[in-house]
Each structure stands twice: as structure tokens, then as C-alpha cells.
Amino acid sequence: MSSDSHRFDAKSVLVTGASSGLGAAAVRRFAAGGAMVYAAARDQERLAEVAASCAELPGDVRFGHLDVADPASCREAVAAAVGEFGHLDVLVNNAGRHDFRLTPDVTEAQWAQDIAVNLSGVFFCAQAAIPHLLEAPGGGGNIVNVASVAGVVGEAYSAAYTAAKHGVVGLTKALAVEYLRSPLRVNCICPGGMDTPQVHTIDVPDGADFELIMRVSAARGFMSADQVAAAIVFLASDDAGAIHGSIQVVDHGHLAG
């Protein structure tokens, strides 16, 4: 991790989907930079473990419940983060879900759930956070949305996920234009294949081509969650002050050729 332990002193950060994988890595990165972090997810036991893992870091990590599929829960999580720290500087929209299914097998409920978690939750968290981010101390907060390489290309057996992640990219651009004349910054990370707990439990549907699913691993293999978290933290930092409306692909060069 970065040796700059004061990069986010006095800054408050809300990270969604923070109980494992990329979200947990982002919490640790921000805490290492001195941030006040509100880690939000459904699994409170895992969140407690993430917070405990940050105990020796200079930041302050609190945690609470969030179900991004529920707009009211999104509003409550933002209010809780502001209540804990008095203000909000950064929102990291990381929560998501991904199941592989052949398109003819996707039910209406599965489609609705994927869109609710992967796209609507991003919108409702941003909607609740923006009024606070516009009043962030020091002049403007920022949002980092986590999409996927499936937000810029197609991904097999992932119709709902791909549609939602393309939506996150579009939402990022829409918000960036809407707040072009304000101090608020909005950017998006599109990670490729990461070595997270989820990747070790991939359920390949019957009739699927496993090689198509594993294309995201690229020639250099899976990235660590911490590598991608470093990109999130950079975009949220003052060092990225000129970056607004950007779609940052982080994929070991997979989409380069």
C-alpha cells in the first residue's frame, strides 16, 4: 500500500459492497490513507472483520447495513455515513452481483435483481449522496462508480450484468455532464478479472463455453483486488483533480488488442 498515510486525512468515504473482495480492499486502502470510512454491505459479520483488519491503520472505519437493491436502504446508508462523520467527501459505488446464465434461462426475477443491484443501486446511492458531496469541506466531493470490462464490451452468459454495467458507464457520463460546472467529480472504474472469493465459486451453466467466461483473465492472469482498489483510491484523491467523467479500464491490458 501507499506510504502516504495522510492522503485522506479528515476525508470521509462511503464504500458499498465493502464486506469482501474489491470493496474490502478499497476500505483498507482508504484507511491506510487516513480516511474516515463507512463500510456498508448486507453481511455485518464480514464487515466487522474488515473493520478489525484496519485497526492498526491511521484511518477510522465504521460499518453498517446496506442492501443496494432497496432504494430506502441506499438513502439510509448515506445518512448513516454522514451521521458518523458529519460530512461526506467520497462515494465508492462498488456493490454488485454476477451470475452466469444462458440468456434463455434468465427469469424475470433474476433480470430484475441484477439490474437492481448492479445499476439501480448505483443510481440511488449517488442520488442520496450528491447533495452532501456538493457541500464537502474543501470544495467538492467525488463519486467513483465500479462497473466492469463488461461495461465496455460484451460478456458471454451475462446479459443482465453486461446491460447493467453498460448502464453504470452511461450513468457516470450523465452525472459528469450534469455536474460539469460544479466541484463534484464523477468517474468510473472498469475492472477485468480479479482474484476474489467469488471467482473461485464460478457456477458454469450447462451448455456454456468455459473459455468464453475466462476470457477476462487476460494473458497476465487475474489481478488482485488491491491493485484495482489502488485505482479507485487514486481517482478519489486530490491528485486526480483534473479527471472528471473518465471511464478507466483496469484489466492488465486485456482490451488493448
Question: What do these predicted ranges mean?
Answer:
Residues 148:
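Residue(s) in the substrate-gating loop at a strand-loop-helix junction
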Residues 19-20:
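Conserved glycine-rich cofactor-binding loop
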Residues 131, 177-181, 241:
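Alpha-helical segment proximal to the catalytic Tyr-Lys
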Residues 102-103, 107-115, 213:
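Substrate-binding pocket helix/loop in short-chain dehydrogenase/reductase
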Residues 126, 164, 172:
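Active-site helix of classical SDR
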